[in-house]
């Protein structure tokens, strides 16, 4: 919820949390690399019956240990791990993933590895090779980076859909932003973006349906509306963003809730 406006102050943390609560979000992503910050935010969320994911960015296997210790104290639905390493060879990734998975198992905490820019998972094909090595690897899917990174031809063909679907079939959480094949974040409200909105809604529907087939009856699927400030957000010549990201996030929340409700209703009719 950073604003990064030259002529306006950032919203205070208390204001941000109240906005999230009052807008009807179920929870938030919380940086667990700062214990004091995490304690303050999770105290608010817990007090209002909300949930959270613990976000971290380890550069070593042992970097995950204090995060898991903090989760043991503060709780979390799961740890969202951005693998902040960039090995050139697949074999160099294996010790990191094996180590993080071992620590997660020992702690009894679910850890999801995020597909993210400038991380181990930044490249689509490289990530698919990781899934070859770890078929049960739990991902948090932000597929905006893959659309831009591969610059898929438009309309996206079935072969490229299949590559994205494979990532989504390993995903236990979603980070949501709408991209085009050339911009990693675009407003879902602009008329010229509706083809891209439909593309991502289709991918997210696939992800939700895939997750519902795999998850237990009491499991929770988190969808984080993750709309970043500039340079993620596109700006005009005056440096101002072309859309209101907070309003875009509210629109995305409602779109996903509507999608979820439709899927649940369709599954219920099919089971009747």
Regions found by a protein language model. Give the residues of each.
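Aromatic-rich peripheral "rim/lid" segments of glycoside hydrolase catalytic domains that contact
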Residues: 229-272
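Active-site acidic/histidine proton-transfer and metal-coordination neighborhood
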Residues: 51-139, 148
């Amino acid at each position: 919820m950073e604003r990064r406006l030259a002529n306006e102050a950032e919203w205070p943390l208390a204001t941000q949390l109240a906005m999230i609560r009052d807008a009807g979000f179920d929870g938030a992503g919380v940086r667990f690399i700062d214990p004091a910050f995490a304690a303050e935010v999770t105290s608010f969320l817990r007090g209002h019956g909300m949930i959270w994911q613990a976000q971290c960015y380890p550069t070593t296997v042992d970097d995950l240990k204090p995060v898991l210790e903090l989760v043991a104290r503060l709780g979390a639905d799961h740890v969202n791990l951005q693998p902040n390493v960039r090995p050139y060879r697949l074999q160099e990734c294996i010790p990191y993933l094996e180590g993080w998975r071992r620590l997660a198992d020992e702690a009894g905490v679910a850890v999801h590895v995020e597909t993210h820019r400038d991380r181990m998972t930044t490249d689509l094909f490289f990530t698919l090779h990781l899934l070859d090595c770890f078929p049960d690897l739990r991902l948090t899917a932000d597929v905006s980076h893959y659309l831009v990174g591969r610059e898929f031809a438009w309309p996206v063909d079935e072969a490229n859909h299949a590559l994205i679907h494979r990532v989504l079939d390993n995903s236990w959480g979603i980070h949501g932003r709408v991209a085009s094949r050339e911009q990693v974040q675009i407003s879902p409200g602009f008329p010229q973006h509706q083809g891209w909105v439909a593309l991502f809604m289709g991918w997210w529907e696939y992800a939700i349906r895939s997750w519902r087939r795999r998850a237990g009856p009491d499991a929770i699927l988190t969808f984080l509306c993750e709309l970043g400030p500039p340079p993620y957000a596109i700006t005009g010549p005056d440096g101002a963003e072309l859309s209101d990201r907070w309003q875009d996030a509210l629109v995305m929340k409602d779109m996903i809730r509507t999608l979820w409700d439709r899927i649940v209703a369709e599954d219920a009719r099919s089971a009747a």
